[in-house]
């Protein structure tokens, strides 16, 4: 995933299983399984007997992705409030909160670190639902929503700083056991991400 984010291949680019396996020193099977996971959300497609093709995005694609993401993550938020107080989840959430506060205070110089923190934040929330498919879905979401060629570099500091603040609103609502506020904060955050994604498509 980090390679995709860093190299930023354009839509229509071909991805070779063998070439990727050699690059990362893993088996063709491992690469194929990863690519199949991305294909399930329409990020790439396989040509018969040929290479994988990186797909472009449309507003309809963005809408469908938003709807599925909202369904999964709102379910996860509800499940969080059933987690016993002595479970490791709460320690993880407190550590995430501190990391967000630290990043917010240094956002001007560390804004590029947001995508990794964002992935861990949403993975931690989704893990509460105990659904193995949601974990795989989060991998695909991470690549798509932080795929730099689709995101304008303009105001990246402000955009990431705003997302950090939205995360903190979700975390704080969870910690004070306010399910309604947590759900509302999550829905606002997902809507922000959706609108930013739509705006990036319209700039192309």
Q: Which residues are covered by each model-predicted region?
A:
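Conserved amphipathic alpha-helical segments that form helical-bundle/coiled-coil interaction surfaces
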Residues: 86-152, 165-172, 181-193
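Short linear motifs at protein or domain termini
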Residues: 1-82, 199-204
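Short arginine-rich
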Residues: 191-201
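Short, flexible turn/loop "capping" segments at secondary-structure junctions
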Residues: 13, 46, 118, 162-164
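Short alpha-helical functional segments enriched in proximate histidine and acidic residues
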Residues: 79, 124, 196
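Solvent-exposed loop and edge beta-strand segments that line ligand/cofactor-binding
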Residues: 155-159
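Alpha-helix N-cap/N′ positions at the starts of helices
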Residues: 49, 72, 95, 162-165
């Amino acid at each position: 995933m980090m390679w995709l984010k860093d190299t930023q291949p354009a839509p229509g680019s071909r991805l070779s299983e063998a070439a990727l396996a050699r690059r990362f020193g893993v088996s063709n099977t491992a690469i194929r399984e990863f690519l199949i996971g991305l294909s399930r959300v329409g990020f790439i497609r396989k040509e018969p007997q040929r290479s994988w093709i990186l797909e472009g995005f449309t507003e309809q694609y963005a809408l469908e992705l938003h709807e599925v993401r909202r369904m999964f993550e709102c379910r996860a938020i509800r499940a969080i409030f059933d987690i016993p107080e002595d479970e490791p989840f709460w320690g993880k959430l407190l550590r995430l909160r501190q990391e967000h506060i630290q990043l917010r205070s240094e956002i001007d110089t560390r804004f590029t670190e947001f995508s990794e923190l964002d992935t861990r934040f949403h993975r931690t929330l989704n893990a509460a639902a105990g659904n193995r498919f949601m974990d795989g879905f989060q991998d695909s979401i991470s690549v798509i929503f932080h795929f730099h060629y689709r995101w304008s570099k303009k105001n990246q500091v402000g955009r990431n700083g705003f997302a950090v603040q939205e995360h903190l609103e979700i975390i704080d609502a969870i910690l004070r056991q306010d399910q309604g506020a947590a759900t509302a904060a999550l829905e606002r955050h997902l809507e922000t991400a959706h609108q930013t994604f739509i705006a990036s498509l319209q700039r192309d």
